[in-house]
Regions:
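Metal-dependent peptidase/peptidase-like ectodomains
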Residues: 1-2, 7-8, 44-46, 95-186
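Detector for methionine-enriched segments
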Residues: 27, 36, 72-73, 127, ...
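Active/binding-pocket-proximal capping segment
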Residues: 57, 68, 142-145
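Extended, hydrophobic alpha-helical segments in both membrane/secreted and soluble proteins
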Residues: 49-55, 63-79, 88-97, 102-106, ...
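A short linear-motif detector with a strong N-terminal bias
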Residues: 15-19, 30, 70-74, 102-105, ...
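Soluble metallo-hydrolase cores and metallopeptidase-like ectodomains found primarily
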Residues: 1-63, 74-89, 111
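General small-molecule cofactor/ligand-binding pocket signal
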Residues: 22-24, 93, 185
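Short, solvent-exposed loop/turn segments at secondary-structure boundaries
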Residues: 61-65, 137-139
Length: 186
């Protein structure tokens, strides 16, 4: 376990140059309780946009899903600083049990917040696998056929040429929320 003083010592040592670290990790398999950070930035309305990602990963996790988590934190910071300008609220949620639990975290949230989601959630943006090194195409998937043209126009600023057409939605990510008729984009 690394506490504050050990962390400060590591930072001091890093100032002298690169370090080699050896980790010893114990893994257990089974059903466990986990935390699921959720933050609400209040706008003028109770209506909200849900921005979600997952914090569990396989392997190193930088691409899936560390970069998206960092982007979500930065979005939350910027929205918080500008909250007086928000027409709608923004809810940020980091799911547990996504990769290993087959979307258990988002399913739990949906089950426990269904009425609020059905009544007030106007859109769900799922951030997953953002910022792949060496990528030259930014793609999208959406449940909003009427929004496909908007997404395509938006992505023109990131891609050379025309973006690929949206890929049809199959079971992955967090389509858990479709039952509440919430438009979804990834």
């Amino acid at each position: 376990e690394i506490g504050k003083s050990a962390g400060e010592e590591l930072q001091k040592r890093l100032e002298s140059g690169p370090l080699t670290v050896r980790l010893s990790i114990e893994m257990c398999q089974g059903i466990v309780s986990s935390t699921m950070p959720v933050a609400r930035i209040q706008g003028r309305s109770e209506k909200f946009v849900l921005v979600s990602g997952h914090y569990d990963s396989w392997y190193e996790g930088a691409t899936d899903n560390g970069v998206a988590n960092a982007a979500m934190m930065e979005l939350a910071r910027v929205f918080q600083e500008n909250r007086e300008r928000l027409e709608r609220s923004v809810v940020f949620a980091w799911w547990s049990g996504h990769s290993d639990g087959r979307y258990a975290g988002s399913a739990w949230y949906y089950d426990h917040h269904w009425e609020e989601l059905k009544e007030n959630c106007v859109a769900h943006i799922n951030m997953d696998i953002c910022g792949c090194k060496g990528s030259d195409v930014v793609g999208f998937q959406t449940s909003m056929l009427e929004g496909a043209d908007f997404d395509r126009e938006f992505l023109k600023g990131f891609n050379e040429g025309e973006p690929d057409p949206p890929v049809s939605m199959t079971r992955f990510a967090d389509q858990t929320f479709w039952g509440a008729d919430i438009p979804f984009a990834i």
